[in-house]
């Protein structure tokens, strides 16, 4: 890679999917290659035809070291959205990658960020029964009361993460959300008294 770059190769050259070398290196966890490309001027926020960035790809592949490097790189948009309005946090939440969710939140990803339809990462995790992600999001202060404006996730027409979990028969996720709601109620948080 270094030799190609030394000979003048375009650091942000795209393939037929619109992916760059940085996206591919991130997806496969080649952190040293990612660092080299970034040091040579690769655009950390460049997206492919689906709007995914290197951070999306690394998060989807559960490549923690690559996500850490990308997430700390100067100028990175940790909340960049793809064509579906999904951030890397939405992607990790859907996949049930609890440790990745925690890392992305630590790197500054907005736990309340919404994709199309008003869905947060909590909605995505609840609807899919991604309980590891759900737990990490709840620990990170995700808003359990937020109601999506429209819901095309599975069988529900709209609602809170709890309503989506119940509609999609995600019993453990629903139990976790009911318990979180009860704890918030006991603290007075459901009435805005926090």
State the predicted function of each range.
Residues 24-30, 57-63, 91-97, 124-130, ...:
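Ankyrin repeat A-helix N-terminal signature
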Residues 2-9, 35-42, 68-76, 102-110, ...:
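Ankyrin repeat domain, specifically the short helix-to-loop turn at the C-terminus of the second helix
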Residues 15, 48, 82, 115, ...:
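Ankyrin repeat boundary/linker residues
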Residues 32-33, 65-66, 99-100, 133, ...:
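Conserved ankyrin/ankyrin-like repeat signature
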Residues 107, 140, 149-150, 155-194:
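Ankyrin-repeat-protein effector appendages
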């Amino acid at each position: 890679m270094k030799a190609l770059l030394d000979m003048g190769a375009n650091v942000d050259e795209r393939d037929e999917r619109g992916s760059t070398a940085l996206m591919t290196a991130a997806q496969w966890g080649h952190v040293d290659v990612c660092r080299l490309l970034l040091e040579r001027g690769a655009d950390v926020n460049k997206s492919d035809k689906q709007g995914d960035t290197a951070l999306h790809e690394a998060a989807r592949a559960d490549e923690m070291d690559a996500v850490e490097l990308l997430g700390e790189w100067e100028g990175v948009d940790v909340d960049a959205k793809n064509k579906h309005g999904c951030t890397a946090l939405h992607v990790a939440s859907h996949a049930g990658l609890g440790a990745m969710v925690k890392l992305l939140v630590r790197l500054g990803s907005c736990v309340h960020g919404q994709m199309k339809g008003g869905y947060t990462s909590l909605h995505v995790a609840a609807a899919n029964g991604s309980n590891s992600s759900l737990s990490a999001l709840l620990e990170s202060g995700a808003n359990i009361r937020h109601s999506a404006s429209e819901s095309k996730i599975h069988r529900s027409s709209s609602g809170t993460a709890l309503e989506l979990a119940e509609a999609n028969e995600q019993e453990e996720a629903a139990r976790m959300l009911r318990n979180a709601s009860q704890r918030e109620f006991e603290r007075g948080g459901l009435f805005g008294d926090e």
